[in-house]
Structures are given as structure tokens and as C-alpha cells.
Amino acid sequence: MSTATRVTAASVVPTAKVEPLTCAIGAEVQNVNLGAAARDPGLMAEIRSLLLEYKVLVFRDQDITRAEHVTFARHFGELEDHPVAGSDPDHPGLVRVYKSPEKPNDRYENAWHTDATWREKPPFGCVLRCVECPPVGGDTMWANMALAHDRLPEHIKRQITGLRARHSIEATFGAAMPIEKRLALKAQYPDAEHPVVRTHPETGEKILFVNGFTTHFTNFHTAANVRYGQDFAPGAAQLLQYLISQAQIPEYQVRWRQPNSVAFWDNRSTQHYAVMDYPPCHRKMERAGIIGDTPF
């Protein structure tokens, strides 16, 4: 879809304008109020189309209520409850991520990840509103994992075809918990297994689908076709870390910070990273995660 076509397609709201943020990922959608958007089926269809193309959409100057935030997100599917962060009691599915000098880093930042891949059905996408950001710092970064897959060396693509991997909440959110609480968390949210390369259910893109929640391959074989267990085959751990590190390549990324703005990303085809570089300042974000489907 060309840029000209994109702007024309937004004619359901004639003043809408779409500006790509980088060559790889992300676009700013201007002159759209998300509080009113949910009442316009044509506009919502266009937003979904733009999301599939750009993977991350940002909307400035969104003076919306929590109820409008939830209503917009719920248009794309039911909202999830986060097992660790919890939800706003008055707006189920809306998670408050408030950071201050008095609250230490609690593992929501400084790690590349795709949200909740430890679920059998990881989120379709997430809608994040910046309530308050520090004067400098506090960016959120996203990486295009379809592009990351496309640019892998061909021999790596062949090597990972058909591979599957385990994803765990215990190894991340549970890592700093007392053992009893950690085991209870894992019992409630057992590990999930997903393909290392998933197919996007709407675009057909091949996506590199490993991240900070991924612990090991479950069917890795050596060249001699000998199994050594979960992740003990020579080279398995190194290969996994190599794949996870692809999100760190700047050419695949976009970053954003703007008070009162909203970011909407396709969780199926991206990773993201909240940069913890702003203490002693405040950062207040509110997020709605949309339930997705089983990766294939």
C-alpha cells in the first residue's frame, strides 16, 4: 500500500494524516480522536489496517478517559487481566504502570520482550497511554520482528524452521519472588510452547517469535540428530540468545515518548522495551492488553 493510498484510505476522516516514523516500523496517525473513533466503524477498520502495515501506531494529544481507553481497546477483542500488575478495579483490563523515585524498578523496564508469550494465547496487541512522562528519558522502543526474521542469514532460517520453544512467567516476573509465591504463580500460569517462527494470522508474515520470556528450545537436534534434553544440545543456548538479540538492532526499531499520547502496537509481530533512564522522575503509563490467538 503506497503512502498516497494510505492517506486516501483514511478518507472516513478526511483530515486524518499518516506519517511513517522510520523506514522499518511505526507511524503517527494525526487528527484522530480515539475517544470518538470507537463509534466510527470505518475509521476503526482503517486503524486496524494501518496497524497491520506499520505494527506500531502513535496518536498525539489524546485527552481520553480511562473508560474511552478501554472502549477503544475492546473494539479489537476482549481485554486480559495481568496476573502480576493487576487491573484498575473500576476499569477491568486497564493496567496502571506508575513509577516514581520511591518505587524501585520491578522488571517492567529494561528488557526486550513480547507481552505475555507465556500464555497459550498471547495478546493480539496493546494500547498504551502516556499519562505522565519525565522531562527527558522514559522512551518506549519497539522492534519489527517480521523484518528481523526476513534479514536472518538463510542458513539460520533453515536451522530454525520447525523449531519450538518454551516461554515462562516464572523466569521473569517470578524470578524475584519468594519460592512459595513463585511456585504458585507457575502453577496458575504454566509454561507455554510456541513456534520459534510464527505466521501472522492476518498478513501471513513470518515472525521471529522468541524474546525475554523464552527459556529454551523444546525440539532442538544436533546435526547428528541426537537429543540431549530440553536445551542442552550443543549450540542451542547460543542460537536462542542470538535470535533474541535481533530485537536490539537499531534499524528494526522505533522509539517514542510524548505526554498524553497513545501507542497501539501489534504484539504478534513486535517486541518492546521501556527504557529505565529517568530516575528520579515520575513515569505514569496505562495499558490495555487485547487477548490474541494461539501462535502457529
Where would I find each of the regions flagged by the language model?
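Non-heme Fe(II) oxygenase catalytic core, chiefly the N-lobe of the double-stranded beta-helix
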Residues: 2-262, 267-296
